[in-house]
Every structure is written in C-alpha cells, then in structure tokens.
Amino acid sequence: MIDIDNKETEDQELWKQLPNTEGEERAELFIQLAQQAIYRSSGTEALALAEEAHEIYKAMGAKASSIAMANAITGIGYSLKELNRVDEATKALDGAIDLLRQSNHPFLIDTLRTKASWYGEEGNWQKALEGYVEAAQINEVDGNSEFYARDLFSVAHCYHELGSWSEVITYALKAREVFKEQKMVFEISWCDLNIADAHAELKDGEQAIFWGRKANDIATLRKDNEMICKSSFVMAKGYKVLEKYQDAENLLLAAQDLVAKSGDWPQITKIEKELISIYRLTERNTEADEAERRLSTLTEVVE
C-alpha cells in the first residue's frame, strides 16, 4: 500500500531540487514528479510534467540519449492512459517503442506488453495480438523462459477473443510446454482450460472433455473454485457436442452453484445460456422460458 504522506514528502523534495537543475537532470526530475502524480491519479498534472521532460530532451538534440527520450514519451503515454485517452496513449508508446527498438533496449519487451494490454482493455484484440507476438518473438531468442511462456499464453488469449480456435490451441500448447519445464502448475491449468474451450468451439467434444478434465483436476487439488467452475463449464460444452445432455446439465448446475455468489456476471450469463440451450434441446421449454426470464432480469442491469 502506498503511504500518501511519504509520497507527498517525496514530491516536496523533488520540487525543492528543481530550481537548481538543468538539462537532463531537470528532465529526470520532471519524469519522477510525473510518476508521483500518476500514483495520485493526477493525470493532467502528470501529462504536463512528462511533456516538460520531453521538451527538454528535444531541445538537447543529439546530446539526449534515445533511452531518456523514450522514458519521457512513455511517461506521456501513462499520463494519457490515466486520463482515459487510450488511443493517444498507445500512439505515444509507439514513439517510445521505436526508440527502444533502435537501441535493442531490454525495456522494449515491457513497453510492448504494456501497449498490448492497453489495447486488450479496449477490446482491440488484433492490435493486442501484434504486441504480444513481437514480445514473444524477442523473448524466444534471448529472453526469460517464464516470460516467453506468458507472452505465448497472451497470444493464445488474444486469438481466443478473436475466435481463432486453431491458433488458440497452437499457442496454448506452446505456452504449456514451457510452463511445464518450469513446473508452473497453475499456469498450465489455464492453458488446459483454453485448449479445452477451443476444442469445444471446434465441435470436438472428446478433446474438450479431455483437456477440461486436466484443468479441473489441478483446480480440485488446489481448491480453486474459479477454475473448477470454468473447467466444468467447458467440459459441459464438450458433453453437449457429444449429445450427452444429462452429463452437460450436471456440470453446468455444479458450475452455477460455484459462481452464484462471485459477482462474475459474464460467467454466470454464459452458464445460464448453456443451460437454456440444454433445456431446449431436451424439449423442456417451460424451464428454458423461466431461465430466459431470469437471465433477462440480470442482463438489463449488467449489460
């Protein structure tokens, strides 16, 4: 937890130093002050400070290092993000990324991930995908194995959001292989869940159940109710593909019980829709109508 009093003291010390500085030292102080402003969620102040630093570096011309310039531009990006000006923020990061790429700086990968995550928050999954793919390519050559696997998993997640199911399987399997080398059990279960869901969407019920059960096994051992719920859901989709409707319904009802008090409205909605589908397929239209009525009450509030 951030100690606000300490942060205010740091701000005061930085402001006291400012009149006695110039050039790069002054720009660095502005960047530090911008960071403190972001901690306080003061996006407008942070933006003004980061832009001051950027102007100093521009005035220095060739004397300013590309890394320092990239740092100032990144500060502008974070400030714009704090102001919910996400399009401008991602464009700012593009400038920083170009500078970091030219110098092959280690911060390049983190900045690529940041930009990709911002695109993901906005639902621009194609742009997010491009960032994570580049980060994965860099990490594959000279990066950390764990981060390489995480980038691969992020690529799989983007493909999941784009509905490119074969690619989900390909990249989740690649991530799983690296996670397995690192004995990262929790992360493997998320790979298995995504693989299972992709198989269900591709109408391969057997594989959906196979991979869903793997995720469920780990979740049960870890007493991870979120994963138990989601893996039960994807296995139910697999049983539905195989027209084993009672098995599907049993799993959906179990998932429904687990998610009921969570406030995870998207997952609650998905489960209800699958139950309605099962009721229709088994000609239980009264139950389907009742479930649809309940769901409409929820969706008018949360959507």
List each language-model region with its residue ranges.
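A generic tandem-repeat structural signature
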Residues: 51-149
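Flexible inter-repeat linkers and adjacent short helices
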Residues: 1-74, 80-85, 97, 291-303
